[in-house]
Amino acid sequence: ESVNVVHRWLPRAISGNYGVEKYLLELTRHRPRDIIQLFNELKQQSTGGRLSEQQVLSAEKRYSRDYLLLEMQDEVRGLLSDELSRVAFDAVFSIRKAEFSLEEAYRAGEEFNLKPEDVIQILRQLFDCGTIGMKDLSGVGGHTTFKYRNPGAVFSTRGVQYILHRGIRQAANIASV
């Protein structure tokens, strides 16, 4: 007899309207090691039996803060200069929103003494490593693109809002939209 461990050990939905499978997958970059680490955090929350929604949210917070943010910071460290990699996440997190415009990123960059071209370089590298995605503002429904979902995706500064990966919003103390 096959057993669906997700349905057996986890709540069916999170926040009332998200199916737990989709919710958990959106916290990762669809990499096996991300998924394994998330499930390790879920296992740490277990006290026996089905996990509560609160236990899942606690696991999400630990995964976000103690794993995914550090992984993304390590990736960016190899793509940006030391100076830019030190301020990249602080600048984006200082916007205090899950979705933000290029103009908001420029204003945040000014607070960190970044030139506009530095802000673009940071956003490009954050996009390439999956920290941010782009939401198309020109079409109906606002199609969202993340590089890890579409490896052929190209960074843009036109007609888009940037969206912070759901998996690191807890680490940034930013509410999900």
Model-derived features with residue positions:
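The catalytic "switch" region of P-loop NTPases
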Residues: 1-17
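Short, amphipathic alpha-helical interaction segments positioned at domain boundaries
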Residues: 145-177
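Generic signature of intrinsically disordered, low-complexity, basic-rich segments
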Residues: 81-84, 125, 163, 167
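Short amphipathic alpha-helical interaction segments
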Residues: 112-129, 134
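Transmembrane catalytic cores of multi-pass membrane glycosyltransferases
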Residues: 102-104, 128, 144
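Winged-helix-like regulatory helical subdomains adjacent to P-loop NTPase cores
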Residues: 17, 25-116
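Short, Lys/Arg-rich nucleic-acid/phosphate-binding segment
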Residues: 136-143
